[in-house]
Amino acid sequence: MAKKVIGFIKLQIPAGGANPAPPVGPALGQKGVNIMEFCKQFNAKTQADAGTIIPVVITVYSDKSFTFITKTPPAPVLLLKEANQKKGSGEPNRNKVGTVTGEQVRKIAELKMPDLNAVDLAGAEAMIRGTARSMGIVVQD
């Protein structure tokens, strides 16, 4: 018989940087999950991407065991990394903070494709271009 799922927890945690402090500890503690065990497993799985924000979906079962799935980093994080910027523009239509090439957008779209709700690569690229536009990053073709 399969274990009964009692909840899902969605978090965005720096790769290799999970620790029992907020937001990880309180979110897992509410469901009764072994916080240190999760931190060890997550840090071991993501240590190669250290520092990058990684979304994670944790499935908690009735016996307090858990499984987790890591996703690709959010598109804004990848765009800022490609544009060598710390943050996006506060006024994206007026102030542009950086530029990325069409090739860099394609690379990000290929990386994000499993997590995006896009039919093909062209649709994924359009989503990434829209994200860049809303952050004040210019896409050069």
UniProtKB/Swiss-Prot annotation:
The terms under GO molecular function for this entry are: large ribosomal subunit rRNA binding; structural constituent of ribosome
Q: Which InterPro entries match?
A: Ribosomal_uL11, Ribosomal_uL11_bac-typ, Ribosomal_uL11_C, Ribosomal_uL11_C_sf, Ribosomal_uL11_N, Ribosomal_uL11_N_sf
**UniProt entry keywords in alphabetical sequence:** Methylation, Ribonucleoprotein, Ribosomal protein, RNA-binding, rRNA-binding
Q: Which GO terms describe its biological process?
A: translation
Query: Gene Ontology cellular component?
Result: cytosolic large ribosomal subunit
Supply the CDD domains for this chain: Ribosomal_L11 (cd00349)
Q: Which SMART domains does its entry note?
A: RL11 (SM00649)
Q: Look up keyword Iron-sulfur and say if it applies.
A: no
Q: How is it modified after translation?
A: One or more lysine residues are methylated.
Q: How does it assemble?
A: Part of the ribosomal stalk of the 50S ribosomal subunit. Interacts with L10 and the large rRNA to form the base of the stalk. L10 forms an elongated spine to which L12 dimers bind in a sequential fashion forming a multimeric L10(L12)X complex.
Q: What does this protein do?
A: Forms part of the ribosomal stalk which helps the ribosome interact with GTP-bound translation factors.
Q: Which family does it belong to?
A: Belongs to the universal ribosomal protein uL11 family.
Name of the molecule in the record: Large ribosomal subunit protein uL11
- Origin species: Chlorobium chlorochromatii (strain CaD3)
